[in-house]
From Swiss-Prot:
The keyword Signal applies. It comes from Escherichia coli (strain K12). Repressor of the cell division arrest function of DgcN. Prevents DgcN relocation to the midcell. GO terms for biological process: bacterial-type flagellum-dependent swarming motility. One of its GO terms (cellular component) is periplasmic space. It holds the Pfam family DUF4154. Residues 1-22 form the signal peptide. Keywords: Periplasm, Signal. This is Protein YfiR. It comes from the Bacteria. It is found in: Periplasm.
Amino acid sequence: MRFSHRLFLLLILLLTGAPILAQEPSDVAKNVRMMVSGIVSYTRWPALSGPPKLCIFSSSRFSTALQENAATSLPYLPVIIHTQQEAMISGCNGFYFGNESPTFQMELTEQYPSKALLLIAEQNTECIIGSAFCLIIHNNDVRFAVNLDALSRSGVKVNPDVLMLARKKNDG
C-alpha cells in the first residue's frame, strides 16, 4: 500500500472518530447541567404534576448538555426553542436563556401566558433584571446568583437552602 493511501486512510479514521470525541461533554458543560438540574429539582410549581418542561434557547452554549440523556435522569423535560414565537406557544414551565438579553428575558416573561415560570440565564452576569437565576461561569467553575425581585414575581417556590447556597458561593 502506498504512503498516500495510508495517509488517506489515517485521515479518514481521524475524521470519523472526531464527532465521537466532540460529543463528550466538557467539565464545564457537566457542571452547568448539574447546577441547572439542582435548581430545577429544588423548585416547586403550583398545580404542576410531573416534571416541569424547561425550554432551552438554542443560543445557549450548553444546550446539548442540558438535553442529552446521561447516567442520571433529568428533573425536567428539555425542549430546544429558537425564537420568541416558539417560546410563546411552547407551554413551558421554565426557560433557560443563552445569549438573550436581560431585557428580552423580562419582555418574554411579561408576555408569557403562564403565571409560574422559572428563569435561568447563562449570559446575565449582573443578574439585576431578567432571570431569577443567573449562572456565573468562570473556567470550569459554575456558580449562580439570585435575583430575589425576579424570583418573588416568578410564581415558583424555591427551597431556601438553595438561596443560602447562592449567598455562600457569592460571599466566598
